[in-house]
């Protein structure tokens, strides 16, 4: 995968050179290029200007972005604009991006964008209902979430297939050594070696955690018959506990 990032602050992306993203680059699975669009700005390297019609703040000018995009060699890239007014970023979207060969991220700053910049864009994406100073942190988050899904980046394919949200549910609790730490013991079922009992326990725990913490995820979740029976039992148990 090839990723190009348009930003005023390339140095902010230094953390991407480490951990999973750095390993993906070392394996030759990822190529990242940073483009400071101030280098393409006319008018004394100014990248922002006042909005027509008045208003608060400054807008990112179209010219530096267009000229930077013209300088990037890409055949058919997915162009992502980081914008708090964009569609929310989800795990399923990261899975979709992981299938692409070329991604371009445009990181804004200031009050907003000249609307004409959006003619270059295929996707307008937001991390959530809050506003950041710039798009860099959002881009890094999205890149990290996407790159780890590229085949062969992680050691085991199953290591991300069982992540929270990958199945549509939150992940079940997990434990490692020691068995007993400060009086807190690993559930007996995980020590039993009975794979079917462990599978059912994990399914129950995943459904229960999702129901208690993110019930909205269950509104669109496609339950199997087995999951539906377990989920109904969970709700009944919790309801009895409230009475």
Swiss-Prot record:
BP terms from Gene Ontology: tRNA N1-guanine methylation
Subcellular location: Cytoplasm
Top EC class of this enzyme: transferase
InterPro entries on file: Alpha/beta_knot_MTases, tRNA_m1G_MeTrfase_C_sf, tRNA_m1G_MeTrfase_TrmD, tRNA_m1G_MTases_N, tRNA_MeTrfase_TRMD/TRM10
Gene Ontology molecular-function annotations: tRNA (guanine(37)-N1)-methyltransferase activity
Documented EC number(s): 2.1.1.228
Keyword set, alphabetical order: Cytoplasm, Methyltransferase, S-adenosyl-L-methionine, Transferase, tRNA processing
Gene Ontology, cellular component aspect: cytosol
HAMAP family: TrmD
Known role: Specifically methylates guanosine-37 in various tRNAs.
Protein name in UniProt: tRNA (guanine-N(1)-)-methyltransferase
Species name: Streptococcus equi subsp. zooepidemicus (strain H70)
Lineage: Bacteria, Bacillati, Bacillota, Bacilli, Lactobacillales
